Every structure is written in C-alpha cells, then in structure tokens.
Amino acid sequence: MKPKVLITRKIPENGIKMLREHFEVEVWEDEHEISREVLLEKVRDVDALVTMLSERIDAEVFDAAPRLKIVANYAVGYDNIDIEEATKMGVYITNTPDVLTNATADMAWVLLLATARRLIEADKFVRSGEWKKRGVAWHPLMFLGYDVYGRTIGIVGFGRIGQAIARRAKGFGMRILYNSRTRKPEVEKELGAEFMPLDELLKESDFVVLVVPLTKETYHMINEERLKLMKPTAILVNIARGKVVDTEALVKALREGWIAGAGLDVFEEEPYYHEELFSLDNVVLAPHIGSATYGAREGMAELVARNLIAFKNGEVPPTLVNREVLNVRKPGFE
C-alpha cells in the first residue's frame, strides 16, 4: 500500500505526476487556502504533507496527524513551521532552495527599477487617458525618477538570493554593500561587495533590498528609527517577509518623505495590507510573486517530489531543514 500525501494547494503537474508513482496523492483543489479545521481533519490519515507558507504547521497539526513523518514546504522559507516541535516529534521538514533563486532575485530588480523609474505611475498616466487629456507629448520634468547605474545598493541578507541580487547589481556598475549574520570573504572578493553593520548600510545606500528570513531577531528590524537613517532619496525593496518591516513606520516614512519610495512583494498579514499603502504613489505593490515564474514553480514542485521520494526510499531528503531529526528517526515510512 502506498503512503498517503496531502498537498494543500494545487502545484504544477510535473511534481504531482512524480508523486503519483510513489504515493496516494490528495490535492486540495480549491483556489482558496485550506482552512485550519479542514487541515486538521485531513491530516489524520496522511503520512506526508506538502504545505504552503499560508499554513501554520505546529504542535496542534502534529498531534492531529499520528502517521505524519515528513512535511515538504513549497517555499524556501519555513517560518510557518514549528521546527523545534517537528524535530521533537520526529517529523522531517524540507524546503525548496536554489530552484527559485534567480526568479526571486529578478523580482527584487523588477521592484527596484519600477519604483526608481516610477513605472506604475507612468502606466496609470497613460491608461487613464490623462496623457492624452493633457495634450503634452513630452516634457523635460515628466515623471523624473532616480538613477540606478553607478549608485549604491545595500543588501540585507546575503544568502543565495542576496548574492544573486548582488551579481545583477555588478552589471549596473553599483557599489555593493551587504549585511548578514556572517561575513562571506570569498563572495566579497568575487563581487567586490563590502560587509557593513546594518545601520551604516542604511545610511550609505541608495537602494536597500531586504532578503532576510523572518526570525525573532528580524521581526520589525526596519522600524521608524532605522527608516530615519536612510537617505531621503533612498528606495526600500522588501522580498523577504512582511513582518521584517514595521508597516506603520513605513507608511509614515513614505508619506512624510523620509525615504523616496518602496517596492513591496510581501506584507505583514497577507493577503491584507495597510490601506494607506494603496493611496501612495511612491510605493509599488505585488502580491507575493517573487518566485512566480513557470520555471521556478515547476522546479519547486520537482524538488518537493524528490524530497518525498527520497524519504520513502529510506534516504535523507536533499533539502532537509532540521537535520537534528536524524537523531530521532531514520528516513522512511516503515
């Protein structure tokens, strides 16, 4: 009898097809996320679980799922999962790094460039008919934005995605600053990047890109005090997690001109956002689509399947997050 896996949202078919060869597969087909009540009911008889960032996987879920042995998170981040509790219960946790690195780095640049050059404002100006209404084809002061080439970028979080952003910055002839938990001398040498304490980085940078995981230490790390350190011409880009930024403080900074603009792909309480953000022209908003390319999402689906299949075969999953679990339980459904 095949082990049973529940996939809490429809993912690309390539991953589902791989899983069907080894598992009894149930997919939550609804466009809306699975409710907490339904999730707790459905996990009662599953051996494996494929989850999204929108699902909180904690002790309550583990207690409701006596057969559950592995959770494959369809994301790089895993702040939606209680890793300590999972390890204690002998549940393996995997994620999907690498395959979405370039797509997410590209998204940071989409937001950076769109904000710097006021692209969304300009698009609205054309679509609304205002350009035609004004009858002015071109004006020297129309939609002036900020130069990118040769400026200074500060990258907060210098893992795979942060480094990919830096490689793109090199092509723009930028000075590259970074902040992370540990220095990376080899990458500094490769990219000409400079390590800098966070507050100094904020003062020096024309563009600040946030790529850190959400932890107790990074919660609201960009607050009112730190926003005031930034240049009034600076632009903040957040592709990390919404709660890394104090949204109330950011709205105030954008409204009062402490910084020039912001590009946001993540929000504190998704799918909800601070209503005042919607009324500000100097912010570009996207609905958490950093990895939303065909290639990245298919790569994520394949990696999810590879992790589960490896576990079923008694092998350590390729992207195991909680390696301490190896001391609690061997891989496999036996």
Swiss-Prot record:
The chain's disulfide connectivity reads none
Which Gene3D superfamilies does UniProt cross-reference here?
NAD(P)-binding Rossmann-like Domain
Species = Thermococcus onnurineus (strain NA1)
The EC number(s) this enzyme carries: 1.1.1.26
Q: Which reaction does it catalyse?
A: glycolate + NAD(+) = glyoxylate + NADH + H(+)
Q: Where in the cell is it found?
A: Cytoplasm
Instruction: State the UniProt keywords alphabetically.
Output: Cytoplasm, NAD, Oxidoreductase
- Organism classification: Archaea, Methanobacteriati, Methanobacteriota, Thermococci, Thermococcales
A Pfam family cross-referenced in the UniProt record is: 2-Hacid_dh
- Indicate the residues that form the catalytic site: 241, 270, 288 (proton donor)
* Residue sites binding NADP(+) per the record: 158-161, 180-182, 239-241, 288-290
The protein's GO terms of the molecular function aspect are: glyoxylate reductase (NADH) activity; glyoxylate reductase (NADPH) activity; hydroxypyruvate reductase [NAD(P)H] activity; NAD binding
Q: What is this protein called?
A: Glyoxylate reductase
